[in-house]
């Protein structure tokens, strides 16, 4: 059987699955059509997923796990597969975890065979995968060790390429391909210092590596050995690396003479781009280079904050609102982040507030209109910074609203799930207040059951919004949430387990949502804390322990019974879920939940929410998405 064809089918199904999970509104005239489209799409996703799992289970995994060495044909097939999973050209990664295990097997085989050129090829593939995984996991500030793992692997591979670039070793390389791989990846190694914050030693090392690579381009030893190598591109990309050392509001903490050097290199990049704009415009737009130059002039104190702001606004107003590649993401998401950073330094005027409000809307509209197959990875990377630099102010957009609209724009089923959990938890809480108000002591400052009854509406409001925010952390791992085509790997389960802590951290950044952080942090913990995650959080120490238990139950109930957004799986019935609660009473679930869910009034209300209520949520989601779809970006 032609496994090339099978792997190509896997790729095409992945693309279909991603598109089906967040369908376009084109051709949908009514909310009922949207609901049907989603249901049909997820049935189709289930079929596509089964076909992809068969390819992995019957062909790829047995090959990767075999003790036998790969044949030349097998290595070629999975090498081609890995390249298609990581498509750097359009900043899109279709399945990084699978690409990682494929590249590791290829590298392992090449080391055993001792052949240098195949080894270099697969080191090249492996370093690209490491970089993509580092960027993917660098969004998770609360878990630096995850990105650190891939950073270290990438740096070790980079050091191997750098050692081969030394003149004595480089001369021994027998082919132009081997030499090109060494030059390219020794240069690329500096990229593994990205996303480090305030590490002065790393900043010094990064600059030293860049200077060394620049010297290579001016050394006749290398240029004469490689006369056909694109030295112009090599030099341009190095200048690009220099210019990005102050990326995202200079998070790396470059300072003093470093900033001066970076600025001067940015000016070189600007001049080089304009020396042959026809050639370089095929790499990046002029505005991309202009934004880098303006930022580095500002940090080198060669441009005032006001002048930098004006330049950013000029670039933003002239942006291409429908450009969905790296340059488009820079113009439409990164430039607003830099403007947010400036607003933190300059007094927030009414004009600033209006600007921030407009930027918030435009970024969400841009994300909503982004095709599912374009630049998802780079969009999520910049969106993570957007959320962490977001500014709240009275009368402006609240973080909760921003987060929910982002979920709606990128993955409607997760948005509907958040609202369903809020409806279920609030419904259960209302009945709990009536029957056992003492369980809510501690919520909204209540010190007695009588106060709980008096503050009934305030407590329900709290539960509603806390539940809406329970999955906040998922906004930074949407590419893992998109994985429907196969079972999650251990690495992906690890990423999923980060979302409570990441969500709590994001919520704590903003006054309007800080009080919901414990619910986000604890909603995957068992009632008795014997299982669940994060392990270090003991929910019994939280004053909102009962709300955590309500949301945990509501979360499990919606996930178990949803047959629209999760129709690729068979949903449980409400009675089956209640039996599960009885079985786990006092361990997984709060002991009072079993009795509460057994009451006829509660069962009737919850049953309504799981049927008509869920349909209404999809109707409302359609209306919200349609309003974004129909309104032009400003």
Question: What spans do the regions from the language model cover?
Answer:
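Amphipathic alpha-helical repeat scaffolds of TPR domains
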Residues: 6-22, 28-90, 115-141, 171-196, ...
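Helix-turn-helix repeat elements of alpha-solenoid scaffolds
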Residues: 7, 23-58, 85-110, 141-168, ...
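Intrinsically disordered, glycine/charged-rich C-terminal tails and inter-domain linkers
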Residues: 9, 13-29, 44, 350-362, ...
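Acidic/His-rich, divalent-metal-binding segments that scaffold phosphate/diphosphate chemistry
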Residues: 361-494, 537
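An active-site-proximal "capping" alpha-helix that borders the catalytic cofactor pocket
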Residues: 419-430, 492-508, 573-593
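Short, charged, surface-exposed loops that flank catalytic or proteolytic processing sites
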Residues: 487-488, 565-575
């Amino acid at each position: 059987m032609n496994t090339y064809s099978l792997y190509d089918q896997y790729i095409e199904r992945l693309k279909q699955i991603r598109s089906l999970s967040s369908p376009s509104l084109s051709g949908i005239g009514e909310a009922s059509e949207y609901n049907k489209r989603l249901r049909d799409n997820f049935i189709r996703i289930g079929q596509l997923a089964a076909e992809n799992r068969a390819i992995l289970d019957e062909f790829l995994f047995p090959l990767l796990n075999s003790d036998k060495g790969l044949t030349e044909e097998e290595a070629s097939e999975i090498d081609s597969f890995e390249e298609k999973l990581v498509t750097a050209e359009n900043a899109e990664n279709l399945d990084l975890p699978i690409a990682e295990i494929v590249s590791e097997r290829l590298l392992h085989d090449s080391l055993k065979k001792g052949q240098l050129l195949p080894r270099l090829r697969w080191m090249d593939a492996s370093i690209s995968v490491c970089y993509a995984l580092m960027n993917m996991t660098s969004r998770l500030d609360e878990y630096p060790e995850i990105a650190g793992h891939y950073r270290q692997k990438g740096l070790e591979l980079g050091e191997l390429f750098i050692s081969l670039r030394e003149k004595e070793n480089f001369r021994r390389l027998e082919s132009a391909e081997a030499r090109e791989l060494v030059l390219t990846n020794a240069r690329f190694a500096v990229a593994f210092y990205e996303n480090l914050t305030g590490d002065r030693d790393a900043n010094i090392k990064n600059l030293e590596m860049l200077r060394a690579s620049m010297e290579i381009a001016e050394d006749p030893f290398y240029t004469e050995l490689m006369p056909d190598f694109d030295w112009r591109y090599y030099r341009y990309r190095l200048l690009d690396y220099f210019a990005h050392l102050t990326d995202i509001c200079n998070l790396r903490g470059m300072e003093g003479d470093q900033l001066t050097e970076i600025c001067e290199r940015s000016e070189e990049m600007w001049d080089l781009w304009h020396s042959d704009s026809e050639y370089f415009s095929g790499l990046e737009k002029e505005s991309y280079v202009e934004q880098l130059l303006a930022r580095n002039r500002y940090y080198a104190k060669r441009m005032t904050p006001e002048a930098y702001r004006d330049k950013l606004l000029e670039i933003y107003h002239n942006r291409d609102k429908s450009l969905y590649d790296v340059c488009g993401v820079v113009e439409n998401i990164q430039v607003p982040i830099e403007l947010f950073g400036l607003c933190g330094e300059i007094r927030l005027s009414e004009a600033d507030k209006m600007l921030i409000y407009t930027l918030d809307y435009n970024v969400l509209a841009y994300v909503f209109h982004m095709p599912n197959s374009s630049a998802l990875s780079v969009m999520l990377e910049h969106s993570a910074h957007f959320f962490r630099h977001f500014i709240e102010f009275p009368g402006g957009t609240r973080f909760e609203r921003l987060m929910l609209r982002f979920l709606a724009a990128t993955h409607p089923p997760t948005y509907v799930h958040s609202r369903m959990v809020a409806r279920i938890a609030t419904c259960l809480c209302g009945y709990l207040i009536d029957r056992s108000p003492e369980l809510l002591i501690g919520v909204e400052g209540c010190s007695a059951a009588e106060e709980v009854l008096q503050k009934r509406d305030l407590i329900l409001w709290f539960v509603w919004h806390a539940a809406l925010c329970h999955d906040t952390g998922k906004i930074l791992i949407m590419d893992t949430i998109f994985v429907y085509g196969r079972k999650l790997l251990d690495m992906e389960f690890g990423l999923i387990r980060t979302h409570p802590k990441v969500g709590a951290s994001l919520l704590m950044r903003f006054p309007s949502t800080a009080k919901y952080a414990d619910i986000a942090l604890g909603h995957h913990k068992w009632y008795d804390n014997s299982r669940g995650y994060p392990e270090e959080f003991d929910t019994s120490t939280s004053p909102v322990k009962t709300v955590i238990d309500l949301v945990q139950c509501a979360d499990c109930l919606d996930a178990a019974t949803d047959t629209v957004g999760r129709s690729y799986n068979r949903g449980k019935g409400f009675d089956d879920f209640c039996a599960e609660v009885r079985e786990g009473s006092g361990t997984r679930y709060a002991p009072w939940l079993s009795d509460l869910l057994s009451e006829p009034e509660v069962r009737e209300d919850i049953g309504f929410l799981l049927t008509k209520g869920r349909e209404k949520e999809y109707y409302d989601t359609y209306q919200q998405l349609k309003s974004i779809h129909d309104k032009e970006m400003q």
